[in-house]
Swiss-Prot record:
Keywords: Ligase, Phosphoprotein
Gene Ontology molecular function terms on file: ligase activity
Lineage of producing organism: Eukaryota, Metazoa, Chordata, Craniata, Vertebrata
Modified residues (Phosphoserine): S66
Name of the protein: Erythrodihydroneopterin triphosphate synthetase
Organism: Rattus norvegicus (Rat)
Major enzyme class: ligase
EC number: 6.-.-.-
Domain of life: Eukaryota
Length: 68
């Protein structure tokens, strides 16, 4: 089991705050994600971004800039 996959359960708890990877982004948005499901925060969703920044700080989430 990969490091990221273990945190899918955590991501599911916060599902209302996240959008699925590959849609709902704008080019240049910061996307936070983890695990096989690649949950992400939309940068215009302040609550989700605060949560994701916390997860990112502790190494649970990764982040990238959306290209789609």
């Amino acid at each position: 089991i990969s490091h990221g996959f273990r945190y899918d359960a955590i991501a599911k708890l916060f599902r209302p705050f996240f959008c699925g990877d590959g849609y709902g982004h704008r080019i240049g948005e910061t996307v936070y994600y983890a695990g096989s499901l690649k949950y992400c925060a939309r940068s215009f969703d302040v609550g989700a971004e605060i949560i994701c920044k916390g997860f990112y700080y502790f190494g649970i989430y990764k982040r990238r800039v959306s290209e789609v």
